[in-house]
Amino acid sequence: EHSSKWLSMCSHSFRVADLDDDGKDEILYGSAAIDDDGSELWCTGNGHGDCLCVGKFIKDRSGLQIVASFEEPGNYNGQGHGYGCQVIDARDGGLITGHGAGSTTDVGRCIVADIDPDSPNFEYWSSLQEGVFSCSGSGLVSSTYPTGIGGGVLYNVAIYWSGQPTREMLDRACVVSYKENPDVNKTNKTRLVYFGTYGSNDGNHSTKYNPCYYGDFLGDYREEVIMGSSDMKSIYIFSTNHPTEFRLPHLMTDHNYDMSQAMQNMGYNQGTNLGYYVGAETLKKAE
């Protein structure tokens, strides 16, 4: 039996990960987690949400972190942590930081990634459009967002594409960089590639435009993208043409990443995330 607080806590997706670092997986089905023995691990009371990410987002904090956004102000402001978008400790469900305090709206989208090489730890932002924040709780990183076609803010998924330690945004068949990067000769928020040029469609689901699938299939840490064709008759697999001087093991050898890629289209699509920390301040060029 569960207390009434556990009712209606599920999200439009769920994650399987070793939340409490005991060598066994737990089930995170939204605002609550079930331990490996079937018992209650924790419940935040935040209620239902659309976005749910689990990974290592804070370099010097032990364990994994969760970034999630929530639909129901009555829950996340009432019995929950009080923010529309939150960074949560995966071990106990405790609040690390958040934004959208006292929000009265459905926060339908959020994303987490290391997109700014000048800011330590990962960044996260949401459809509240209050800014790009640090997962560590150190506050606002920037009021400038990753933007795509037509200037819309990007919340879809993050991808290793350009061969850099930071990630780019993958949204509506486009890979877009955030900050100027002379190593790939691109400027702020410049489109790196549009897969539609080669015959793909813009993605699945007209409000999200997700790829069919993406991940590190070839084993060189840069990720490949699977898209349907514009005529819906073919499947395309795209691989980056950007060289890299950085080296990482095949990302799918990391259990957290492997689970995240396997579950990315179980419900609403969620991006891939590693279970160990890789950021611009830690990943060095190969000698």
Predicted features along the sequence, with ranges:
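Beta-propeller-forming repeat regions
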Residues: 1-287
